[in-house]
Amino acid sequence: MDINLKILRYNPEIDRKGHWEEYVLDADPDERILDLLHKVKWFDDGSLAFRRSCAHGVCGSDAMVVNGENMLACQVLVKEVSNPIKIEPIRGLPVIKDLVVNMDSFFDSYKKVMPYLINEEEPGERERLQSPEDRDRFEDTTKCILCAACTTS
C-alpha cells in the first residue's frame, strides 16, 4: 500500500525554520513508523536525521510526534495511524536537526528532582524491606524510559 509520509525537516546549516517534505512509500500495514523512516533514510534521502537504538520500546530514543501525538516510532504500526502520516520532532526541546532534539534540558530537570530513593540510614546487615503500599507510591515512575514524550506533550 502507498503511504504518504510528511516529515518536518530542519537543518540549521541551511534552514531558518523547519519545512515539510513529502515521501511516498510502499509499506506493509504491519510495518512500524521507524521502518518507514529507515526506508526514507536508506533509499530516498540519506540526510534525514532521527534517533533510534533498540527498536523495541525500551530505550526511548525514537520519541517523536506522529499525527499530532507523542509516541515512540518503534511502537506504532502503519495500520494504527491515518494516511498521510505527519512526523515531527517532540515539542518543547530545541531541534538539532530534523527529528533529533537536544535532550540536555530534559535530563538537567530530571536530575534536579532526584528521581531515586534516598535513605539517610546506614545500610544494615539485611536487606531493607518495602511494603506493597510503599512500592505503590512510586510504581509508575519505575516504568519511565526517559524518552521525554510525556513531559513534552
Regions found by a protein language model. Name each.
Residues 1-152:
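Signature of N-terminal electron-transfer/Fe-S-associated modules in redox systems
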